[in-house]
From Swiss-Prot:
Reactions listed under catalytic activity: (R)-4'-phosphopantetheine + ATP + H(+) = 3'-dephospho-CoA + diphosphate
Organism, scientific name: Leuconostoc citreum (strain KM20)
Role noted for this protein: Reversibly transfers an adenylyl group from ATP to 4'-phosphopantetheine, yielding dephospho-CoA (dPCoA) and pyrophosphate.
Gene Ontology MF annotations: ATP binding; pantetheine-phosphate adenylyltransferase activity
Localisation: Cytoplasm
Primary site of residence: cytoplasm
Pfam families: CTP_transf_like
Quaternary structure note: Homohexamer.
Pathway: Cofactor biosynthesis; coenzyme A biosynthesis; CoA from (R)-pantothenate: step 4/5
CDD domains, alphabetized: PPAT
Annotated S-S bridges: none
GO cellular component: cytoplasm
Keyword terms, alphabetized: ATP-binding, Coenzyme A biosynthesis, Cytoplasm, Magnesium, Nucleotide-binding, Nucleotidyltransferase, Transferase
Highest classification ranks of the organism: Bacteria, Bacillati, Bacillota, Bacilli, Lactobacillales
Name of the protein in its database record: Phosphopantetheine adenylyltransferase
Length: 158
């Protein structure tokens, strides 16, 4: 069984993230969306809130699971039996970063990094941008995030 991990902070999940999840679900027997967190960063949503939001959004994808990650990515991959890491690339800056991380991960464990190019309509979407425009009261957030996330953002930011 081919198992892939799609890790991220997902604060919040964007349509770009969702596109990568959907495409990865067609490539692997199982995809685990790994909700990571950085205790040094102030997140808008808790890991548990992100897990609930993402689980609702991907509920129609039978081979996709959502879990909160602990420890190193490669350690979490061993726990879930994943050999592949899926990452999305929006631009060359993302590529440089992901290439370096892929090298470290492959040095630590027998893992392969699969890089998927963002679709043109998602290349400018980032969680930071979504939070910024959401905090300014933008009404058309559905262009950037799934509806359940729009509702959660409106509740959290207003």
């Amino acid at each position: 069984m081919s198992i892939a991990l799609f890790p991220g902070s997902f604060d919040p999940l964007t349509n770009g993230h969702l596109d990568i999840i959907e495409r990865a679900s067609l490539m692997f027997d199982k995809v685990v969306v790994g909700v990571g967190y950085n205790t040094g960063k102030k997140a808008l949503f808790t890991p548990e809130e992100k897990l609930a939001l993402i689980s609702e959004v991907v509920s129609d994808l039978p081979n996709v699971e959502v879990a909160i990650m602990h420890g190193l990515t490669v350690q979490f991959m061993a726990e879930i039996g994943a050999r592949f890491i899926v990452r999305g690339l929006r631009n060359s800056k993302d590529f440089e970063y992901e290439r370096d991380i892929a090298g470290v991960n492959s040095a630590l464990a027998d893992v392969e990094t699969i890089l998927l190019l963002a679709k043109p309509e998602n290349q400018n979407i980032s969680s930071s941008m979504v939070k910024e425009i959401g905090s300014m009261g933008a009404d058309n957030m559905a262009k950037f995030v799934p509806k359940v996330v729009v509702d959660a953002l409106k509740e959290r930011l207003n």
